[in-house]
């Protein structure tokens, strides 16, 4: 969901392809904002995950990403909107990591934590690959990223919904 969205704010000139003709410095500042916001968002999510339902926080993060991405692509793109998008999306980007790992540990214990989280991480890498690959294919077909951005919005909404049925209570009779 996130990986295919990075292309339009990279420092490689892709901002120009969506109509922003400022220098590549905007891309560099955008990436920096994403990184800074990542730190704040990830620490905050971990803190919140110790106090509130992880599944609802994850659903909220994916919903937030979906809303932010939708707003970004339906409003006029300006240097300011790129920076705002970068800060907001950056705050949610890796915020899922402490919540997902915490949820796995809570549900399945820590005995197989490395294996289970490794599988989750691997599945995210597959999704990242297919998101970027599909984004490139769709750009070749249509000449812009609009279609893949809408697909990303759909994936974000689906990600929010699939977290809701998670049962956060552990069956302690199961060995861990």
Where are these regions (language model features)?
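Extracytoplasmic gate region of multi-pass secondary transporters
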Residues: 1-45, 131
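Intracellular helix-loop hinge segments at the cytoplasmic ends of transmembrane helices
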Residues: 9, 13, 98-107
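C-terminal transmembrane helical hairpin of 12-TM major facilitator-type secondary transporters
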Residues: 26, 33-38, 44, 49-103
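Multi-pass alpha-helical transporter architecture, strongest
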Residues: 153-176
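A late C-terminal transmembrane helix in Major Facilitator Superfamily
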Residues: 94, 107-142
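Transmembrane alpha-helical cores of Major Facilitator Superfamily
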Residues: 32-36, 63, 118-126
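Interfacial helix-cap and linker-helix signal at transmembrane-aqueous boundaries
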Residues: 15-19, 48-49, 134-143
């Amino acid at each position: 969901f996130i990986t295919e969205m990075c292309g339009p704010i990279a420092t490689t000139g892709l901002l120009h392809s969506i109509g922003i003709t400022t220098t590549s410095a905007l891309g560099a500042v955008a990436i920096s904002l994403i990184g800074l916001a990542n730190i704040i968002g990830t620490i905050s999510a971990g803190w919140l995950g110790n106090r509130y339902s992880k599944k609802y926080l994850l659903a909220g993060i994916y919903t937030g990403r979906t809303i932010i991405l939708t707003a970004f692509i339906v409003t006029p793109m300006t240097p300011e909107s790129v920076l705002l998008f970068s800060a907001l999306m950056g705050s949610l980007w890796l915020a899922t990591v402490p919540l997902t790992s915490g949820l796995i540990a809570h549900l399945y214990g820590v005995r197989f934590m490395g294996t289970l989280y490794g599988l989750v991480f691997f599945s995210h890498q597959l999704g990242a690959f297919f998101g970027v690959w599909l984004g490139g294919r769709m750009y070749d077909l249509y000449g812009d990223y609009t279609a893949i951005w809408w697909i990303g919005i759909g994936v974000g909404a689906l990600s929010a919904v699939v977290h809701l049925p998670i049962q956060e209570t552990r069956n302690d009779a199961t060995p861990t």
